[in-house]
A protein has these predicted regions:
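Iron-sulfur-associated redox domains of electron-transfer enzymes in respiratory
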Residues: 1-362
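Short cysteine clusters
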Residues: 16-19, 65, 70, 75, ...
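Internal, well-ordered alpha-helical scaffold/interface segments
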Residues: 55, 360-363, 367-373, 377
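Ferredoxin-type iron-sulfur electron-transfer modules in oxidoreductases and energy-metabolism complexes
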Residues: 95-97, 338-367, 381-484
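Glycine-centered loop/turn positions within well-structured domains
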Residues: 241, 377, 439
Length: 484
């Protein structure tokens, strides 16, 4: 069959060697007419098709990507297509947030004897891609910089945590300290508005411990490096989810970790505070007054209500108290989770945009990216830093090309590696020195995972299995497409 109309488009197909490739061969032997746009890549199993293959193809200029494997229950490697089904469905729901039309990607199942079905699949998919036309390229998009509306109503009252019993926490840590090699918490950084990690090994170290609205760094990030040692960690509710997720994946041992939980009433977004303060030489003092924080800079007081200056993650937080803790200090904030999950500010902004606007949005922000990898280094779940794809040369995933495409590809790699694992702690975005809203990519995947897998949220249950590490023979919310 000739090209459907006009210019031949670039469509990439990843076909399972045992079934779908055989089905394509059966169609060819039967001389069934097929469009010629598809370029086939033969793979051992659909379970070996990393979602990054699909993203790399789409970002590099493919107009469409098709993945086809054996029917569920017929996999030659027992369960490869069961795992593929979950990964690829999450990917399909992730693509639109990048500005890529989800219809440019499809996956299906075709056996070696189904030559006629293969003809239907490739013809229908090629027709769909021709209707969409050539895929827009991020390099050609007009840069668009837009900020999220941070005035969205929070799910719960936000206060500065001024009543947090710090002395009680210090006493609890000192009591446990002889049994532990170290306890991780926060101390004042170079001024009162900046917290730094604190590694407490002596009672004198414990006296340096601070608690307040600027305790934003996630101490769970350091736990994997202490595996095999007895260690304590002081956590807010969001931090505790990271600890639970590390336990789920056996990246830390439960018997080795003592969790000190403190109730949290929200933390301030230091980037927005800095912007409001303008030029200043030094921050002299930070004080909490009810539901606001008063920052004294260069002798002048500035009042910051948490309802206006809280971090975006605090506005949709459903865990004001630690999910799991050995020692709980203070009374948790009374809170009833809402019946419907609120949309985070950055994700709400992207939801309001068209696909071309989203592509322009990422073009504008990726031009600002320094490729410093602070987002990776701050992430508590990014634990393969000894062999990260950013530096890997075998396989060679990324080049050192300073292009928006390579920068966005790194961010999508990070986001997809966190699929079903990201707890939404926001450290990636907080650590970004130029303030790129990269948390929205992780939030979109978390939303897709929650939709597909009965509201699953990472880091809430230590005995749960992350969805992409398992499968169901019959998936409740994933269904085969009709190609007729």
């Amino acid at each position: 069959m000739p090209v459907l109309k006009g210019k031949e488009l670039r469509i990439v197909g990843f076909l399972c060697n045992w079934c779908s490739y055989g089905g394509a061969d059966t169609a060819g032997v039967a001389r069934a007419g097929q469009p010629t746009d598809l370029r086939i890549i033969r793979v051992p199993c659909s379970g070996r098709v990393d979602p990054l293959f699909v993203l790399r193809a789409l970002l590099n200029g493919a107009d469409g990507v098709l993945v086809s494997g054996c029917h569920p229950r017929d996999c030659h490697y027992a369960a490869g297509n069961f795992y593929a089904r979950r990964r690829l469905e999450v990917l399909k729901q992730f693509l639109p947030v990048l500005g890529i039309d989800g219809d440019r990607f499809a996956y299906t199942w075709v056996s070696a004897s189904e030559g006629q079905k293969w003809q239907q699949v490739v013809t229908k998919f090629t027709e769909r891609i021709h209707k969409l036309g050539p895929a827009p390229r991020i390099e050609d998009a007009e840069p668009l910089l837009r900020l999220a509306d941070m005035a969205l109503k929070p799910l719960r009252p936000l206060g500065a945590g001024q009543d947090a019993p710090l002395e009680e926490l210090k006493a609890a840590i000192k009591e446990k300290l002889p049994e532990l090699d170290c306890v991780i918490g926060w101390q004042q950084g170079y001024d009162a508005a900046h917290a730094a990690p604190l590694f407490m090994r002596t009672p004198e170290d414990v006296d340096k411990l601070t608690w307040g609205p600027f305790n934003t760094p996630n101490p769970a990030t350091y736990l994997p490096s202490y595996k095999g040692k007895k260690v304590g960690v002081v956590v807010k509710g969001c931090d505790s989810r990271s600890v639970v997720e590390l336990l789920q994946e056996n990246l830390i041992n439960r018997d080795d970790v003592t969790i000190f939980g403190m109730p949290c009433r929200g933390t301030l977004d230091m980037a927005r505070v800095d912007a409001a303060l303008g030029d200043y030489r030094a921050i002299d003092n930070v004080a909490s007054t009810g539901d606001a924080v008063v920052v004294t800079a260069d002798g002048k007081e500035h009042r910051f209500p948490l309802s206006e200056y809280a971090q975006g993650k605090c506005r949709t937080c459903v865990t004001p108290a630690a999910v799991q803790a050995d020692v709980r200090v203070g009374a948790p904030e009374p809170f009833t989770p809402p019946s419907e999950t609120a949309t985070p500010p950055e994700l709400a902004l992207l939801d309001s945009m068209s696909l071309p606007e989203r592509l322009s949005f990422w073009r504008g922000h990726m031009e600002r990216c320094l490729r410093c990898y602070a987002c990776r280094n701050a992430c508590p779940m990014c634990v393969c830093r000894d062999f990260c794809v950013a530096e890997s040369r075998d396989p060679h995933w990324l080049t050192q090309d300073d292009s928006v495409r390579e920068k966005l590809f790194f961010q999508t790699i990070h986001a997809l590696h966190l699929a079903g694992r990201c707890t939404g702690c926001g450290e990636c975005q907080r650590a970004c020195p130029v303030g790129i809203p990269i948390l929205a990519l992780r939030q979109q995947i978390a939303r897709a995972v929650g939709t597909l897998f009965d509201g699953y949220a990472a880091g809430m249950q230590a005995d749960a299995t992350p969805p992409l590490l398992g499968y169901e023979v019959e998936e409740k919310n994933i269904h085969e497409r009709d190609w007729k």
